Amino acid sequence: MKTLIINIKELLQVRDNHIDKVSGTEMGVLPKIDDAFLLIEDNLIANFGSMSNCPTIKTDQTIDAKGKIVLPTWCDSHTHIVYAGNRIQEFVDRIKGLSYEEIANRGGGILNSAKNLNQTSEEDIYNQSKVRLEEIMQQGTGAVEIKSGYGLTVDGEIKMLRVIKKLAANYPIKIKATFLGAHAFPSEYKENHADYINLIVNEMLPKIAAEKLADYIDVFLETGYFSVQETEKIIEAGKKYGLIPKIHVNQFTAIGGIKSCVKHEALSVDHLEIVTNEDIENLKGSKTMPVALPSCSYFISIPYTPARKMIAAGLPLALATDYNPGTTPSGNMNFVVATACIKMKMTPEEAINAATINGAYAMGISQTHGSITKGKSANIIITKPLTTYYEMAYSFTSNLIENVFIEGKII
């Protein structure tokens, strides 16, 4: 099937050659073509350019995008959208003054989600999760990483990962699965960390590998959760099964986690609300992508990732939602992009780069997603008529998306 989109006001994120990511000052450059066309053949980008060079060919569908912006779909590299129930009461508790840590110490937080999940059938979890997945697709997300981590038992973690696998099989959106058994210590292991880590290493990982349920491995490396040493043991065990690390780190404290993650060649380090000068030096020249989660900072009123400091140091940066029931019950990447501009002082160019090509890198798919490049997946957003692409951040609560293509088809 051939689809030709013509008269595009601004075609964004055009890259003639494949690139993995953009860093530092390059993040402020967003290549675009004004008055452009885009040709989709089957599920791939076949051609693009200025309307003056638009080919005269027979197509199955022609779309006039006069006045509209076209760009790649968002690549959301950090989510927890497979879960059961909600944590609305904790939302009210925070309003009344309780901290994240205080809620967790009272049996809330991750352990609350684990309790809900383990009491819910796999079918019910799938049915709840697919609604969230369909919603984020309509909001322009064309690739998503989904974590386990609300099982915290062998059966619970396997159940979550099977749901993720089923979602990937039933929907056109690109899905990457991450095993996050080390999300928190279950209450019965609170005083016996070694036994829970052994459960992850000796029972969870072999079963996950046998069913090929995960691409990545994650750990919540944070004070009160998993230490650097505990994290390293889990990372090393995961690597034996081919699982690449993508790590939660520096959300509340800096305890040397980033240095460890870089040493172990983590694909990404995520959260980074607290970043030291030493952390920045450790990230320089590495293959590890820093990932900011601004809607989490917004929702639970914690600091924002210091994007300006990191970009000025020459680092790359990706943006993701952290969609989860406790601290970010939203998967709207449009809000993430706008919040990055408003609260983190990223330019629209930087934010769009962070949410497309760098987001693709942070989930290992930048060779097929994240830019308008010949041969890449035809995952694109067509906006409503706009004055400029800056409006995508400026009109931060408006739905500016008219159509979303995933794998060459309007969803």
Swiss-Prot record:
It is an enzyme of class 3 (hydrolase). Fe(3+) binds at H78, H80, H248, D322. Pathway: Amino-acid degradation; L-histidine degradation into L-glutamate; N-formimidoyl-L-glutamate from L-histidine: step 3/3. Catalyzes the hydrolytic cleavage of the carbon-nitrogen bond in imidazolone-5-propanoate to yield N-formimidoyl-L-glutamate. It is the third step in the universal histidine degradation pathway. The keyword Iron applies. HAMAP family: HutI. It is found in: Cytoplasm. Zn(2+) binds at H78, H80, H248, D322. This is Imidazolonepropionase. Its cofactor is Zn(2+); Fe(3+). GO terms for biological process: L-histidine catabolic process to glutamate and formamide; L-histidine catabolic process to glutamate and formate. One of its GO terms (cellular component) is cytoplasm. Its EC number is 3.5.2.7. GO terms for molecular function: imidazolonepropionase activity; iron ion binding; zinc ion binding. The keyword Cytoplasm applies. Binds 1 zinc or iron ion per subunit. 4-imidazolone-5-propanoate binds at R87, Y150, H183, Q251, T327. Belongs to the metallo-dependent hydrolases superfamily. HutI family. It catalyses: 4-imidazolone-5-propanoate + H2O = N-formimidoyl-L-glutamate. Pfam families: Amidohydro_1. Keywords: Cytoplasm, Histidine metabolism, Hydrolase, Iron, Metal-binding, Zinc. It comes from Flavobacterium psychrophilum (strain ATCC 49511 / DSM 21280 / CIP 103535 / JIP02/86). N-formimidoyl-L-glutamate binds at Y150, N324, G326. The gene is hutI.
